[in-house]
UniProtKB/Swiss-Prot annotation:
Provenance organism: Laribacter hongkongensis (strain HLHK9)
Primary location class: cytoplasm
Protein name according to UniProt: Arginine--tRNA ligase
Organism placement in taxonomy: Bacteria, Pseudomonadati, Pseudomonadota, Betaproteobacteria, Neisseriales
Cell compartments where the protein resides: Cytoplasm
Known partners and oligomeric status: Monomer.
Reactions accelerated catalytically: tRNA(Arg) + L-arginine + ATP = L-arginyl-tRNA(Arg) + AMP + diphosphate
GO cellular component, one term: cytoplasm
GO molecular function, one term: ATP binding
Classification via InterPro entries: aa-tRNA-synth_I_CS, Arg-tRNA-ligase, Arg-tRNA-synth_N, Arg-tRNA-synth_N_sf, ArgRS_core, DALR_anticod-bd, Rossmann-like_a/b/a_fold, tRNAsynth_Ia_anticodon-bd
């Protein structure tokens, strides 16, 4: 049981015993040390509802609150807050066995779920660009955390590998192959796509050929499918190069693109019709939803099949949900997709429920996110206004980090410099994004993200190496030594370390990775205060052993937490 859950359950029992069973404890960490360690704010609302004096009700709750061996002080503050100060011995006991556990005391969930996180999901017609960064790293972090908590994780890369543009690309592939330039052209997907588009726009004969390839592709023509597969293979190889550099856990096995649902789309439309959910509007097949209204107050329509018989993204997404329920038996699906797609997902989820493609027990969640902006406050672009390739951004991150490392440590071996530059550069880009509330837009700033001060990856990586350096200076470390929490800085660090499990559970529940970055930054800053206030190397005996143990738990927490963000730590920098 997590620390917060333990206190919550104790408070809930006390509220029941005090005659207010429907009241919520509303427990949260105290905002300042003078308010204790935790604060319960639920009494005031319960008192107001019953027209009682909130301080009197708070006292009744405290009289029933059993925190023996847990709290050293419980007091009423202000109009009826209950402030709880934890006993140092209690914290010591909770942390004492953490080093014996590779999971740092984080328990697996009692009822594991089958969870899919759908993320990254680029269109395979082009190379990945900076617009793919947020989905890729937010999704990867959520997948890592949810899996770490003991759930069965299914990663989903719903790539765009189908549609009319593939007729154009296949036609151009045939043309370049005949000219002996296919391999050269395919090595640069952006140029390949651009050249194909020019041919399509300027040459009517080529455009007709491309449309014919679409028909043949959708009809399952073996020769065209073979060409399409080659194109998909090359495109995925580009994606995998980005994933490797980013340290993202997606593999070829996680790819199930739009093409996988192609044969299901007519069935989806038939099943919607059988449920009397379809209407026809100017030849198109539409689902009208009373839950969504336009400006005139009329139900909004969602097209699932166009007048020409073609299907839309919504139809494919419906097929994917149906498959994920029937074949994968998922309990929860998390879609990490740009916030601008919010209405699409809410409408698609509503249709799924009405059609029975997903039962109510199957959680469907859209985890949206804002836009990465340039210094001008507009979406991040090249100086000339073009799209920034993601691989080029990551290369620049490494080069900038390499320059910093070379400046600070010019005598390091070249291989060591490159290793540090990779960890720091890639970590900086990822952390700068993950540390922001995902709902917000943010401004991309090289100087801020690569700084060794403040809430950045380099600061946390440096904090880890600083702890690691302590252990290179001691002759012996006894992990079984008892924790002795006597100084305020020791207690504050121990209190922070004891909340790791709470934070991970909250990240998994809310899908906000910045809660983890926030926590790790607090751990690092609290350790620095502890390091200044409580000498480790100059202390002796049981005191030194205890402080070393706190330092080791700190290092392991930083390493595990950063690992869940997909960020490397270094033993030295």
């Amino acid at each position: 049981m997590t620390l917060t859950q333990l206190l919550h359950d104790k408070l809930a029992a006390a509220l029941i015993a005090a005659g207010v069973p429907d009241a919520q404890p509303l427990l949260q960490p105290a905002s300042r040390p003078e308010f204790g360690d935790f604060q319960a704010n639920g009494v005031m609302a319960a008192a107001k509802q019953r027209k009682m004096n909130p301080r009197e009700l708070a006292q009744q709750v405290i009289d029933k609150l059993d925190l023996a061996g847990i709290a050293s002080k419980i007091e009423i503050a202000g109009p009826g807050f209950i402030n709880i100060t934890l006993a140092p011995d209690f914290l010591a006991k909770r942390l004492d066995t953490v080093l014996d556990d590779a999971r740092l005391g984080v328990r697996s969930v009692t009822e594991p779920q089958r969870v899919m996180v759908e993320y990254s999901s680029p269109n395979l017609a082009k190379e990945m660009h900076v617009g793919h960064l947020r989905s890729t790293i937010i999704g990867d972090t959520l997948a890592r955390v949810v899996e770490f908590l003991g759930n069965n994780m299914v990663r989903g890369n719903h790539v765009g590998d189908w549609g009319t543009q593939f007729g154009m690309l296949t036609a151009y592939l045939v043309e370049t192959r005949q000219a002996g330039k296919a391999d050269l052209e395919l090595s640069d997907l952006e140029t390949f796509y651009r050249n194909a588009k020019i041919r399509f726009d300027e040459d009517p004969v080529f455009a007709d050929t491309a449309r014919n390839y679409v028909v043949r592709l959708q009809g399952g023509d073996a020769d065209v499918l073979k060409l399409w597969e080659q194109f998909v293979d090359v495109s995925l190889a580009h994606c995998e190069a980005v994933y490797r550099k980013l340290g993202v856990g997606l593999t070829r096995a996680d790819v199930r693109g739009e093409s996988a649902y192609n044969d299901d789309l007519p069935v989806i439309v038939d099943e919607l019709a059988a449920k009397n959910l379809l209407s026809e509007d100017d030849g198109a097949k539409v689902v009208y939803l009373d839950e969504f209204r336009n400006h005139d107050g009329d139900p909004m329509g969602v097209i699932v099949q166009k007048k020409d018989g073609g299907f839309l993204y919504t139809t494919t997404d419906l097929g994917a949900v149906r498959y994920r329920h029937k074949e994968l038996n998922l309990d929860r699906v998390i879609y990490v997709v740009d916030a601008r797609q919010s209405q699409h997902f809410q409408q698609m989820f509503t249709i799924c429920r009405k059609a029975g493609f997903a039962p109510e027990a199957m959680s469907l969640e859209h985890v949206g996110f804002g836009t990465m902006m340039g210094d001008d406050g507009k979406p991040f672009k090249t100086r000339s206004g073009g799209t920034v390739k993601l691989i080029e951004l990551l290369d620049e991150a490494e080069e900038r980090a390499y320059a910093l490392v070379s400046e600070k440590n010019p005598d390091l071996p070249e291989e060591e410099k490159r290793k540090i530059a990779h960890a720091v550069g890639i970590g900086a880009v990822k952390y700068a994004d993950l540390s922001k509330n995902r709902n917000s837009d943010y401004i991309f700033n090289w100087d801020l993200m690569l700084a060794f001060e403040g809430n950045t990856a380099p600061y946390l990586q440096y904090a880890y190496t600083r702890v690691a350096s302590i252990f290179r200076k001691v002759d012996r470390f006894d992990a079984s030594a008892p924790l002795l929490i006597t100084e305020p800085a020791e207690k504050q660090l121990a209190l922070m370390l004891a909340q790791f499990s709470d934070v991970l559970n909250e990240v998994a529940r809310t899908c906000f990775p910045h809660l983890l970055t926030q926590y790790l930054y607090q751990v690092a800053t609290q350790f620095m205060r502890f390091y200044e206030a409580c000498p480790i190397l100059k202390s002796e005996g049981a005191t030194q052993a205890s402080r070393l143990k706190l330092a080791r738990i700190t290092a392991d927490t930083l390493k595990t937490g950063l690992g869940l963000l997909g960020i490397e730590v270094l033993e030295s920098m």
